[in-house]
């Protein structure tokens, strides 16, 4: 059966107190609306329509790579009105449409699949996702008849004292038979205190026609919406622990899961150990047997097997097998570090290639450079890559030794098996096998301190 989905993402999110549209606030490194889209894709949903309004262009930009369609809700006149705005997307389709909200990022693909299966097997015209909660205050209640079938949804403010005792709540997420939904959308009215068109009224219309309406109860955490910064933090914590549990089940050791921050799309292979305080973001891939000591940030990078990283930042880069990084190293985008290399403390690498076995142990800047294997950089080496207008390239051959406090003024080439004397400023090509010394000859002026009256 054909399966489609509509995501309601037009709300202003006033309680967030933010210029950013609510659905674009991130949970575990990804916008809430993109979390929902990803979940629906994993649920074999064929077409997805995003109903947008507030900050529409920003939402489009953030979701441009997700292959969703868009419907515009110029005025936010309720959830029923949002489905009216998606009418063009729904017309001509047969089957089931799942309706979700863009501010509920905790729903899982397993739950979506279960809901659709429940809907189809029961031959329901509408299915409501519900949850049993300890404190149902503020939520619409699911009222069932003596046979356990859904009778109606009653908003909290309209509940009788007996109905207030019901702790099964409406999540605001549904599955509908598309044709029945379309047949009833125009029957909605806004004769209520808010002057809005409520999607819950569709349930009542269907029941009046004698249509079957079902309800499936799910984990309360999955239906939690985000309307405030506090709820955003709560969703972050729930999803973070869910992600961390998945990695541990796959053979990753997390020393302190509550204080380890791993993004939704991060991949980690078995026998890697992650200490607390690490932040792994984007499309990062950590291969087997790595050790990430406390307090590193790694984003959109590939870390090969056997790497050790201490308190460092690695962005959009590649680190080869059995390399050590840090503490306090900064590897900037488009860098590639070879195998068995050493990138030490207070070293910054930018848009450079570092060969296998090369050691850059401390207090060094390498930018826009191609460095061979087996090299050694002394403390305080700087690749002077910027002339005030252009970023220039430096090439350093294999097995070269760069002495302490050396400036390599780009563009410049240092060939294989060369030595650069400490304190040199290199501006010309150094031939293979040569020693380059580029510093003034030392001069000692006898008795100078006494002559200047500086002797103590």
Swiss-Prot record:
**Catalytic center residues:** 362
Catalytic activity reported = alpha-D-glucosamine 1-phosphate + acetyl-CoA = N-acetyl-alpha-D-glucosamine 1-phosphate + CoA + H(+); N-acetyl-alpha-D-glucosamine 1-phosphate + UTP + H(+) = UDP-N-acetyl-alpha-D-glucosamine + diphosphate
> Would you kindly state one Gene Ontology biological process term found in this protein's UniProt entry?
UDP-N-acetylglucosamine biosynthetic process
**Chain spans, region Pyrophosphorylase:** 1-229
> What's the subunit arrangement here?
Homotrimer.
Q: What is its EC number?
A: 2.7.7.23, 2.3.1.157
Predominant subcellular localization, coarse grouping: cytoplasm
PANTHER family, sorted: BIFUNCTIONAL PROTEIN GLMU (PTHR43584:SF3), NUCLEOTIDYL TRANSFERASE (PTHR43584)
The UniProt record gives the binding positions of UDP-N-acetyl-alpha-D-glucosamine as: 8-11, 22, 73, 78-79, 140, 155, 170, 227, 332, 350, 365, 376
Requisite cofactors? Mg(2+)
- Positions contributing to Mg(2+) binding: 103, 227
Can you quote the record's cofactor note? Binds 1 Mg(2+) ion per subunit.
**UniProt-listed InterPro entries:** Bifunctional_GlmU (IPR005882), GlmU-like (IPR050065), GlmU_C_LbH (IPR038009), Hexapep (IPR001451), Hexapep_transf_CS (IPR018357), NTP_transferase_dom (IPR005835), Nucleotide-diphossugar_trans (IPR029044), Trimer_LpxA-like_sf (IPR011004)
> What positions does the entry give for acetyl-CoA binding?
385-386, 422, 439
What GO terms fall under cellular component here?
Answer: cytoplasm; membrane
Give the metabolic or biological pathway. Nucleotide-sugar biosynthesis; UDP-N-acetyl-alpha-D-glucosamine biosynthesis; N-acetyl-alpha-D-glucosamine 1-phosphate from alpha-D-glucosamine 6-phosphate (route II): step 2/2; Nucleotide-sugar biosynthesis; UDP-N-acetyl-alpha-D-glucosamine biosynthesis; UDP-N-acetyl-alpha-D-glucosamine from N-acetyl-alpha-D-glucosamine 1-phosphate: step 1/1; Bacterial outer membrane biogenesis; LPS lipid A biosynthesis
Organism, by scientific name, is: Clostridium novyi (strain NT)
What is the name of the protein in this document?
Bifunctional protein GlmU
GO molecular function terms listed in the Swiss-Prot or TrEMBL record: glucosamine-1-phosphate N-acetyltransferase activity; magnesium ion binding; UDP-N-acetylglucosamine diphosphorylase activity
The segments labelled N-acetyltransferase in the record are: 251-456
Q: Which family does it belong to?
A: In the N-terminal section; belongs to the N-acetylglucosamine-1-phosphate uridyltransferase family.
Q: Where in the cell is it found?
A: Cytoplasm
Sorted UniProt keywords = Acyltransferase, Cell shape, Cell wall biogenesis/degradation, Cytoplasm, Magnesium, Metal-binding, Multifunctional enzyme, Nucleotidyltransferase, Peptidoglycan synthesis, Repeat, Transferase
């Amino acid at each position: 059966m054909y399966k489609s989905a509509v995501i309601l993402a037009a709300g202003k999110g006033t309680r967030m107190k933010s210029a950013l549209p609510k659905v674009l606030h991130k949970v575990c490194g990804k916008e809430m609306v993109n979390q929902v889209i990803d979940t629906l894709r994993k649920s074999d949903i064929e077409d997805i329509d995003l109903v947008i309004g507030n900050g529409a262009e920003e939402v489009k930009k953030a979701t441009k790579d997700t292959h969703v369609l868009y419907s515009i809700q110029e005025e936010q006149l309720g959830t029923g009105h949002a489905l009216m705005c998606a009418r063009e997307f729904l017309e001509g389709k047969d089957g089931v449409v799942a309706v979700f909200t863009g501010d509920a990022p905790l729903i899982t693909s397993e739950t979506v699949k279960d809901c659709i299966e429940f809907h189809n097997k029961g031959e329901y015209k509408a299915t409501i996702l519900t949850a049993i909660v300890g404190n149902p205050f503020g939520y619409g209640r699911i009222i069932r008849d003596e046979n356990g079938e859904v009778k109606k949804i009653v908003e909290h403010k309209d509940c009788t004292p007996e109905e207030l005792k019901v702790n099964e709540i409406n999540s605001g997420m549904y599955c509908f038979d598309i044709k029945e939904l379309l047949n009833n959308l125009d029957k909605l009215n806004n004769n209520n205190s808010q002057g809005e068109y409520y999607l819950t009224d569709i349930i009542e219309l269907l029941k009046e026609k004698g249509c079957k309406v079902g309800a499936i109860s799910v984990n309360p955490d999955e239906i939690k919406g985000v309307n405030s910064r506090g709820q955003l933090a709560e969703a972050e914590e729930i999803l973070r622990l869910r992600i961390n549990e998945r990695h541990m089940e796959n053979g990753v050791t997390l020393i302190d899961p509550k204080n380890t921050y791993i993004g939704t799309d991060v991949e980690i292979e078995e026998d890697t150990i992650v200490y607390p305080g690490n932040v792994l973001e984007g499309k990062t891939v950590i291969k087997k047997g790595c050790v990430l000591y406390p307090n590193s940030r790694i984003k959109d990078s590939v870390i090969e097997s056997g790497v050790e990283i201490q308190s460092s930042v690695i962005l959009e880069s590649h680190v080869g097998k059995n390399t050590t990084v840090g503490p306090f190293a900064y590897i900037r985008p488009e860098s590639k570090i070879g195998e068995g290399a050493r990138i030490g403390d207070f070293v910054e690498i930018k848009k450079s290639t570092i060969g296998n076995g090369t050691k850059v142990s401390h207090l060094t800047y390498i930018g826009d450079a191609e460095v061979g294997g087996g090299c050694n950089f002394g403390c305080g080496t700087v690749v002077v890559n910027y002339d005030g207008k252009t970023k220039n390239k430096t090439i350093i051959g294999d097995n070269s030794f760069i002495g302490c406090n050396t400036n390599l003024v780009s563009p410049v080439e240092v060939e294989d098996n060369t030595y650069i004397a400490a304190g040199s400023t290199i501006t010309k090509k150094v031939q293979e096998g040569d020693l380059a010394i580029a510093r003034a000859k030392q001069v000692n002026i006898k008795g100078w301190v006494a002559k200047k009256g500086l002797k103590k």
